């Protein structure tokens, strides 16, 4: 009897033996890479998959138009590594979801099940990445180990020996064990890998700019991985800017190029370079993309290969993230922030930007695709010059109203001049938009107003007097009957759709009135005893008082004194602990005193100086010249301080506790926790997070 063996099954069995530990794979891929859990729903974007194969030229899809996105369920994920370069990649097996199955579970069935939630809560293993210097990559040299890595990742070193030395065993992504000699020596003393390091450099063909990753597993084993250097400066090697300009050099202070969400400009002349030392070699072939797209359209299972270090966005995106992003009605002028990872994946930074246009990237082949839907401009264009288009689910919305930019050094009596933004008409003329803000939502344009009124931010210097009153600046309550042609409300009956069953939702309708612009006041303004509450101008979260409001504060203090003498307890000074409380009318028509951050601005019938210390301090990461502002007045304990710093810099809280130092008002250097937190908030003016707490760094 002859037995036939399934060749595909044998191949899968052989590949299963080569699969990596998921934790080591993620350590090599970078902290921002998130693979979809098994059994979760994702949207597969053939357009994004084609970008993975553009080293061979544009991908052509014969036999009709391919849909922009296909809803699929993840059947399996295999974490693997290239046998020649050690570059990690993943093979994702997808099963298209039938049309009659798409509406059953909704957003709740997007992969955040019990298994996915448990995996997300698991504590990540300790890992450390370092970009190799020229000295580290020299043949015959040694590797300078950062102190943090030596003390937290490597086995404990016996410092009583002279000199302290040990043998370190590290397993690479293929299971090969490498032996290094770890010694602590020199003047000043430092940790070094000596014997065995040159062999590792030669075998792995490491050069300066490559990154080395060390990870300690749960059972104490040490693993080592590699991240190849990206050529071409900002944007990674896969994105070379269109000729004639040469590829930019890395910006000073850190190259924000190498990470999975770093996007390139979609110019036709762009080519994908290779990571294999200058050879133009795409890891994914165009025919593989065409085959996967055809299988997806026909509803058959298919497999895709994803390289997280390829500097192209993930093309298998969590379904819930896409749906949530497309519920937003995008239009020009929206402010957003987006996370980027440094070249060695050691730090995550957020960059601010503005939506400059909302337009499909390829209207010929993908007319309804949300892929790279947003054209953006950045507040720091030098670092992000190649990032010209982004997908909506990669950004976090900060403000959905265009900012009103005021002259930063205007004279105090200069009248307010509001620029005539086409998206924000002031004079009653409402132009019909030429392009809808969301091309996927038919009938909804950038001039649509939302049932949920959102305040608009005002940027610029303080203005003591405006040509128009602040209350007049409110475009108060436009009735739906007055809205012109082309100004649509979101609570219409029909839900627009895009390809493959993706429904573009809208917020729940509340009433037929919406407020286009609100400055520093709630959306529901009510009168009390015929008096209108004055609006308040906010700058960086603090109230800016005009001369009129200051005079009102004097009058209010007199009224409060009179009402208190009459025994009316309701008219006493408001001493609430809210961050900012504006003047308001109470039941008897008197006005409560102004307060800022819980400190009354009226005392002894006189207005206090509003320029007092606000409890802010600057936070600096080691080797950074630019600090970040932290408001200590909203922090209640050292535990909350460490949590905020961990979220700000993407560092584990446990790693921060012994590395945060500060200088008080007298300039003395102290460690957080040396004094009570209440005293710390009063004296701290500068925080320093030192990854290396040696004496030289502390002296700085």
Swiss-Prot record:
Residues of the DNA-binding region: 128-230
Signal peptide annotation: none
Ranges of residues in domain PB1: 614-697
Chief location category: nucleus
UniProt biased composition (Pro residues): 239-250
GO CC entries: nucleus
A Gene Ontology BP annotation from the UniProt entry: auxin-activated signaling pathway
Pfam families: ARF_AD, B3
Subcellular localization, as worded in the UniProt entry: Nucleus
Keyword Transcription regulation recorded: yes
Comp. bias (Polar residues): 565-594
CDD domains for this protein: B3_DNA (cd10017)
Annotated spans, Disordered: 234-254, 560-595
Record GO terms (molecular function): DNA binding
Keyword terms: Auxin signaling pathway, DNA-binding, Nucleus, Transcription, Transcription regulation
Tissue: Expressed in roots, culms, leaves and young panicles.
InterPro entries: ARF_dom, ARF_plant, B3_DNA-bd, DNA-bd_pseudobarrel_sf, PB1-like
Family: Belongs to the ARF family.
Self-association and partners: Homodimers and heterodimers.
Domain comment, as recorded: Interactions between auxin response factors (ARFs) and Aux/IAA proteins occur through their C-terminal dimerization domains III and IV.
Function: Auxin response factors (ARFs) are transcriptional factors that bind specifically to the DNA sequence 5'-TGTCTC-3' found in the auxin-responsive promoter elements (AuxREs).
Protein's name according to its UniProt entry: Auxin response factor 18
């Amino acid at each position: 009897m002859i037995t036939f063996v399934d060749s595909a099954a044998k191949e899968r069995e052989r590949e299963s033996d080569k699969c990596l530990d998921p934790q080591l794979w993620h350590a090599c891929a970078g902290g921002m890479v998130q693979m979809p859990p098994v059994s979760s729903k994702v949207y597969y974007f053939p357009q994004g998959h084609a970008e993975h194969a553009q080293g061979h030229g544009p991908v052509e899809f014969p036999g009709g138009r391919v849909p922009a996105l296909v809803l699929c369920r993840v059947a399996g994920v295999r974490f693997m590594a290239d046998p020649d370069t050690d570059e990690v990649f993943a093979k994702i097996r997808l099963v298209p979801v039938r049309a009659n199955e798409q509406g059953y579970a909704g957003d709740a069935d997007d992969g955040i099940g019990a298994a996915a939630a448990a995996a997300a809560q698991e504590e990540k293993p300790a890992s450390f990445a370092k970009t190799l210097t020229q000295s580290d990559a020299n043949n015959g040299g040694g590797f300078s180990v950062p102190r943090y890595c030596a003390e937290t990742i490597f086995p404990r070193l016996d410092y009583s020996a002279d000199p302290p030395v040990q043998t370190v065993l590290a397993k690479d992504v293929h299971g090969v064990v490498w032996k290094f000699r770890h010694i602590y020596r020199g003047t000043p003393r430092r940790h070094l890998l000596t014997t065995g390091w040159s062999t590792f450099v030669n075998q792995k063909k490491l050069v300066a700019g490559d990154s080395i990753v060390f990870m300690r597993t749960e059972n104490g084993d040490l693993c080592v991985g590699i991240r190849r250097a990206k050529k071409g400066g900002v944007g990674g090697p896969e994105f070379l800017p269109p000729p004639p300009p040469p590829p930019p050099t890395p910006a000073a202070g850190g190259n924000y190029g190498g990470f999975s969400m770093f996007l390139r400009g979609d110019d036709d002349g762009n080519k994908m370079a290779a990571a294999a030392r200058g050879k133009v070699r795409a890891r994914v072939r165009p025919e593989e993309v065409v085959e996967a797209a055809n299988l997806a359209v026909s509803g058959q299972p298919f497999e895709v290969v994803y390289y997280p270090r390829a500097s192209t966005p993930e093309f298998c995106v969590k379904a819930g993230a896409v749906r949530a992003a497309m519920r937003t009605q995008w239009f020009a002028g929206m402010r957003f922030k987006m996370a980027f990872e440094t070249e060695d994946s050691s730090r995550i930074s957020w960059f601010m930007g503005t939506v400059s246009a909302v337009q499909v990237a390829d209207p010929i082949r993908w007319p309804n695709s949300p892929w790279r839907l947003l054209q953006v401009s950045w507040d720091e264009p030098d670092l992000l010059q190649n990032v010209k288009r982004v997908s909506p689910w990669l950004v976090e919305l900060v403000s959905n109203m265009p900012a009103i930019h005021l002259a930063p050094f205007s004279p105090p009596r200069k009248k307010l001049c509001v620029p005539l933004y086409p998206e924000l008409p002031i004079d009653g003329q409402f132009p019909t938009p030429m392009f809808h803000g969301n091309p996927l939502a038919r009938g909804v344009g950038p001039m649509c107003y939302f049932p949920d009124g959102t305040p608009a931010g005002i940027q610029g210097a303080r203005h003591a007097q405006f040509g128009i009153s602040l209350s007049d600046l409110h475009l108060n309550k436009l009735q739906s009957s007055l809205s012109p042609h082309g100004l649509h409300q979101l609570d219409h009956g029909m839900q627009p759709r895009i390809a493959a069953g993706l429904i573009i939702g809208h917020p729940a309708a509340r009433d037929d009135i919406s407020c286009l612009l609100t400055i520093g006041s709630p959306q529901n303004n009510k009168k009390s005893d015929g008096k209108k509450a004055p609006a308040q101008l906010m700058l960086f979260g603090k109230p800016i008082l005009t001369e009129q409001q200051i005079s009102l504060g004097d009058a209010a203090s007199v009224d409060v004194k009179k009402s208190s003498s009459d025994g009316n307890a309701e008219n006493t000074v408001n001493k609430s602990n809210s961050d900012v409380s504006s003047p308001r009318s109470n039941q008897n028509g008197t006005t409560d005193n102004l307060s800022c951050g819980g400190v009354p601005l009226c005392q002894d019938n006189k207005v206090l100086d509003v320029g007092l210390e606000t409890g802010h301090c600057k936070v600096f990461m080691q080797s950074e010249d630019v600090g970040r502002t932290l408001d200590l007045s909203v922090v209640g304990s050292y535990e909350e301080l460490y949590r905020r710093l961990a979220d700000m810099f993407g560092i584990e809280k446990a790693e921060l506790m012994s590395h945060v130092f500060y200088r008080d008002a007298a300039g003395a250097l102290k460690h957080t926790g040396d004094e009570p937190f209440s005293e710390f908030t009063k004296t701290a003016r500068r925080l320093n997070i030192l990854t290396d707490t040696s004496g030289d760094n502390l002296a700085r």
